[in-house]
Design a protein with these regions (language model features):
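Preference for bulky hydrophobic residues occupying beta-strand positions
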Residues: 102-104, 163-165, 178
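A translation/RNA-centric and nucleic-acid-associated enzymatic feature enriched
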Residues: 161, 174
């Protein structure tokens, strides 16, 4: 797959500072509930105390999470993996080893109160970062996340990244998940994001050999193109 050139891409209207945010990398697999509690507390501190905007990069222990639109019927057979509802936007997804989570805590009030622009910026950030890995990512009208053309599902498109955010007092939290090399069979236990005509893929399944630190470098390098 050829790398897509993105030079000259216009800045997002959300871009307000070359120095923000603070980046934090978590080592090891993180339990879901305590990490989300810490994220919620930091998001609240951004609004109440002027804490720094932040992007947290991590991997979770295996867990299914359901957003505000998640239906019980789409949780098919979770087995021994915990299934938790979390209040973000979206439906069911899987988090686990081999998946890069980016939790994005930004002051949306300082960025025009534009939630739609935030989501578009997150999508564009993922697409640009994937392009730097030699993968062409796409949006699908009316459907969340970033998709790649594989021909392996009824739609011909498989999801490689999920996006789900929550806004509290005009501060974003939650964020996105990029499949580097997770256990893709884990997605068979749910209807991922409620979409039945698309599969799930990963960078590894597409033949891309890249480490998690190398993916992180691409994410950090592209962030200020859009925020």
């Amino acid at each position: 797959m050829r790398k897509t050139a993105l030079s000259g891409m216009p800045k997002s209207p959300l871009n307000i500072s070359g120095g923000s945010p603070h980046w934090r990398h978590f080592d090891g697999l993180q339990p879901y509930a305590p990490l989300v509690q810490s994220m919620q507390e930091h998001a609240a501190a951004i609004r109440a105390e002027g804490a720094a905007e932040a992007v947290w990069l991590l991997q979770h222990e295996a867990v299914y999470t359901g957003g505000t639109s998640a239906r019980d019927a789409d949780l098919l057979a979770p087995g021994d993996i915990p299934a938790l509802r979390n209040g973000r936007g979206g439906q069911w997804t899987f988090h686990g080893p081999g998946q890069r989570i980016a939790y994005v805590m930004l002051d949306i009030a300082a960025r025009g109160h534009d939630v739609r622009a935030l989501v578009h910026g997150l999508e564009s950030w993922v697409i640009a970062s994937l392009a730097d890995c030699g993968v062409a990512g796409h949006r699908r009208d009316g459907l969340p996340g970033i998709w790649v053309q594989t021909g392996n599902s009824p739609s011909g498109m498989d999801k490689i990244a999920a996006i789900g955010i929550r806004i509290s007092r005009w501060v974003s939290w939650h964020g996105l998940a990029i499949n580097l090399d997770p256990e893709l069979a884990a997605f068979d236990a749910i209807v991922p994001c409620g979409v039945r005509d698309g599969g799930v893929t990963s960078l590894a399944a597409l033949g891309v050999q890249i480490s998690m630190p190398q993916l992180d470098q691409r994410l950090q390098a592209r962030f200020h193109d859009f925020f």
